[in-house]
Amino acid sequence: MAKLTPMMEQYIQIKNEYKDAFLFYRLGDFYELFYEDATRAAQELEITLTKRAGGKGDPIPMCGVPYHSAENYIKTLIDRGYKVAICEQVEDPKTAKGVVKREVVQMITPGTVMESTMLTDGENNYIGSLSHFQDGSYVIVYNDLSTGENRLAFINDGWDAVIHEFYNQPIKEIVISSNLPEELQIQLKERLNVTLSYQDEVTFNAEFRELSENLNDERLMKAFSRLLNYIQTTQKRSLHHLQKAEVIELKKYMSLDMYSKRNLELTETIMKKSKHGSLLWVLDKTVTAMGARTLKKWLERPLLSKQKINERLEVVQGFYDGFMERESLRDLLKSVYDLERLSGRIAFGNVNARDLIQLKQSLSRIPAIQETLRQFDQPEITRLAEMLIYPEQMVESLEKSIVDEPPISIKEGSLIKEGYHDQLDTYRDASRNGKKWIAQLEHQEREETGIRSLKVGYNRVFGYYIEITKPNLHLLPEGRYERRQTLTNAERFVNEELKEKEKLILEAEEKSVELEYDLFIQIRDQIKEEIPLIQQLAHIISQMDVLQSFATVSESNNYVRPDFNDEQLQVTKGRHPVVEQVMKDGTFVPNDVVFDKSQNMLLITGPNMSGKSTYMRQVALTSIMGQIGCFIPAEQATLCVFDQIFTRIGAADDLVSGQSTFMVEMLEARHAISNATDRSLILLDEIGRGTSTYDGMALAQAIVEYIHHNIAAKTLFSTHYHELTALEDSLHHLKNIHVRAEEHEGNVVFLHQIKEGAADQSYGIHVAKLADLPNELIERASVILEELEDDSNKKPTPTKDKLESGQLSFFIEESNKKKAEMPKQEKTHNNQEQSVIEDLKNVNVLDLTPLEAMNELYRLQKGLKQY
């Protein structure tokens, strides 16, 4: 039986070590993929699948991509959640005995991307790890390999808290123990849409001792080691740029669960998953990539410390007041490149000369930035100037060494300036002098042969040559040159003198290129030692950029600086920060909001499309803006510090997610009332809409009462159940407000104004008219509405005693009364009809998704039609 070729044996041996990755196997100028890798890659990358002989059995499936354009193909695979192992030739094929030695030099995974073309400038690219301990606690670790950031957090509130924490970060890959229960692994993959990787080795590596100085708990050390061991195993190179681990004390930040982040559209919109239309879109006036990433991190973790909030607000105030100085600062910051990721590439070894020029240009701006900061009349801003350290020696070294416009490649020369290195100058002189001699040779040979068209040229295959056109060959003295190449219209020759000069020139050029590469590596390694300083500068500049961004957006959008206290929230003429920017005509209607000790729950009524949800989101968004240190859209504002914000606002339910709309409502409501405190903000929009009227009304009232009596969180509760407005008489901290609307000539006009008291009608039919439903349908609905209202007027209203009892007994009594008045149906159904009825009785509506409910209804209806 035929054996595999030695090369394919080598491939299989390497592939067996990287079974969960596409193996990009270097063959000459291509990366080749074989077997199942080739079949899948051909589909994913839309490239041709071929076959090659492997020395055993049937031909082997194969596909390949050119190495010089492989990055785009790798990016496609990484974006789809795959891993790629890069297998390179690690010895010179000219000196190799047998098969050229190859080994994997790097594993690229969704969470360990370093190539700039695969990264988004304004976003972190986190890899995380999750470790579970016997005491029930979890430790989450985040690392952004491109910036060197390391952060850890304890999670002591159970599995849901783990999911919420991961959801709030741009996580691409999570490293876990292979012993984590399978059902939890499935939840991580499905709920977070991440790649899972495994690392069971958590032994602490002494190499990481300096990085873990801030960790004083064995659980933190093990969790950190799990992630670092995985990164070191996959990357196989220097991790010199990794920063000391920072422990995130979650209790110092506002908690925003996954529902709130989604419903409030903090960083992306619900429908389009786009930054445009989110709060981040409005606030982002940063001019550096570092600042954009920092802004997003701040937005996801608002502060709880009033002192720290006010420290940020002080700097924003200073930037706000100094318009001209701020514009000068913005112009300077625009010329600062991404220092965090530049330092990462320097440490990683994939930096090029253009990157070093970007570093030089960025650092050279620091003196001007310092001078501009000193012009502000604000101590906190001038203190920033003193925190910046100008690395003058590094800038001077780069100025002397690297040419201003270097090539991308660092292995083809033309990187180092003249005068930087004596030996390099000698090689260059030899090369230049040789080329000058060749130019003189051409003139000399033309004179001596009399052939005016004779020329001296060069190509990579044949080197230097003397070219004579065929019509002039008869003028060439016999034996003067040695024939080298025959062309259609000419002959090419050499002589001994030319061959000697060629050798000298090429040796000089080769040595020059080699020396330039060595010098570049030396310069890079010198800068590598200064990475902590570069990262410190990046940290200061990124925060400065965010704070000037807050000042810029506050000035352009007419925001006001908020005050903070412990109890009261009072915003005068507040505006929704996003909606007012989308409505560029300036027609947004501002509204007030007041919460204090006597009034911590607002029950909002009013028609659909009137602005209830917008008002609720507005309160939450302005609170978040204040707690990250930004001014807010209002005329005047006093805010309290919220420890958590919970939301249940619709428009994001998934019909086929496996959970009904009502179940989603209940889960989100449960999450809020189970975790909220008296320092929290709760937004509940139309609770109970997903079930029957009586069930929904009963649950809505019970939730209102529970929050009022047991939690005392500041709450905005919108409802279509107008009966609930009577609760104002019995719940002393609840106040009715409504969104004003008026009828004019048979049409409804939404004024979007919040007024005290309950709404007097819902205007639902008017909304249907705006939706352009058929006139016949609208007219019929109006008739039915009049009949229902007449019937309703004959019924008693719920008494205060019944409302205070915590039960909607009135509605239950009415329901029982209707049942009693219904005539008993004669049992005339045949067995088949009765079977359908029994099926209908047994349907558990609350366990069905809307799509499943429609399918079940169709089946039952079809069964009845047969009879």
UniProtKB/Swiss-Prot annotation:
GO terms for molecular function: ATP binding; ATP-dependent DNA damage sensor activity; damaged DNA binding; mismatched DNA binding. Keywords: ATP-binding, DNA damage, DNA repair, DNA-binding, Nucleotide-binding. It comes from the Bacteria. One of its GO terms (biological process) is mismatch repair. GO terms for cellular component: cytosol. InterPro entries: DNA_mismatch_repair_MutS, DNA_mismatch_repair_MutS-lik_N, DNA_mismatch_repair_MutS/MSH, DNA_mismatch_repair_MutS_C, DNA_mismatch_repair_MutS_clamp, DNA_mismatch_repair_MutS_core, DNA_mismatch_repair_MutS_N, DNA_mismatch_repair_MutS_sf. SUPFAM superfamilies: DNA repair protein MutS, domain I, DNA repair protein MutS, domain II, DNA repair protein MutS, domain III, P-loop containing nucleoside triphosphate hydrolases. Pfam families: MutS_I, MutS_II, MutS_III, MutS_IV, MutS_V. ATP binds at residues 606-613. Belongs to the DNA mismatch repair MutS family. This protein is involved in the repair of mismatches in DNA. It is possible that it carries out the mismatch recognition step. This protein has a weak ATPase activity. This is DNA mismatch repair protein MutS. The lineage of its organism: Bacteria, Bacillati, Bacillota, Bacilli, Bacillales.
